[in-house]
Amino acid sequence: MGQGLWRVARNHHLQQEAYSETGYLSREQSRRVASSNISHTSHRKQAQGGIDIYHLLKARKSKEQEGFINLEMLPPELSFTILSYLNATDLCLASCVWQDLANDELLWQGLCKSTWGHCSIYNKNPPLGFSFRKLYMQLDEGSLTFNANPEEGVSYFMSKGILDDSPKEIAKFIFCTRTLNWKKLRIYLDERRDVLDDLVTLHNFRNQFLPNALREFFRHIHAPEERGEYLETLITKFSHRFCACNPDLMRELGLSPDAVYVLCYSLILLSIDLTSPHVKNKMSKREFIRNTRRAAQNISEDFVGHLYDNIYLIGHVAA
């Protein structure tokens, strides 16, 4: 009886082992087949990748043999962006490569108006044969001439029909241009007070704090290096323009153009005192308030104190 049970158990165990071995063999065979397929696929991809790399290297080699990449294949938007950073000389060189783009009128029009914001010719019907590329060259040439001799520069602009012979048109041109030498411009404005008058009226100081407005004014119209009649003229014109732009504030503070004139001179002197390394004993806030109110008695003490703080924190008004 016991031996019979032992035989049954042994046969059952052997059957399980045989089943397990058979399953293992089938699974192992499947794994090997799959591995073989993956290896074959990988080998095929590697071969394909090798072919792609070969073609890329071959194409690159052929490009190198031909020379530079054809820049005309770039998108127009990218080409316009690149060309917008070039000056006239570089654009002429680029025209050898980008013939169509370098001669594009919209590009040259943008370059002209971004550098010279106002010209009389912009508002006229273009003459026969007009091009913004040619205009850019003339504006560049005229600016260089102005920086050598202001009168000759303005005469050049007028002879080319770029500017009208009008103080207002010349003032607008100067106001919207940043390529003119400020020293030559100062000499020109000192001689052409009619242009200076129109240039001052182009400034808008509405709702600006007095020292900040004075800084903006002197950024466009540079102050002379020494005191004199021209500096007095600039401050006088600024004072009247500042009051005209802020009538409500002037009534509220009780200020007149003469009072603003005094404040401007005080701000210039304070700027020199606080920023000059040669002045060891700097003017205190109390001293500035006392001296300023002595010259203009109707000015608020708090307002004068704010003026001092502005110069102390921000710096010179005519730097």
From Swiss-Prot:
Name assigned to this protein: F-box only protein 8
SUPFAM superfamilies: F-box domain, Sec7 domain
Lineage of origin: Eukaryota, Metazoa, Chordata, Craniata, Vertebrata
Gene name linked to the record: Fbxo8
Residue stretches making up the F-box domain: 68-111
CDD domains, sorted: F-box_FBXO8, Sec7
Physiological role: May promote guanine-nucleotide exchange on an ARF. Promotes the activation of ARF through replacement of GDP with GTP (Potential).
Transport recorded as keyword: no
Keywords assigned: Guanine-nucleotide releasing factor
A Gene Ontology BP annotation from the UniProt entry: ubiquitin-dependent protein catabolic process
A single GO cellular-component term on record: ubiquitin ligase complex
Organism listed in the record: Mus musculus
Sample GO molecular function, one term: guanyl-nucleotide exchange factor activity
Tissues expressing this chain: High expression in brain, heart, kidney, liver, lung, skeletal muscle, testis, and day-7 embryos.
InterPro entries: F-box-like_dom_sf, F-box_dom, FBXO8_F-box, Sec7_C_sf, Sec7_dom, Sec7_dom_sf
Domain SEC7: 146-276
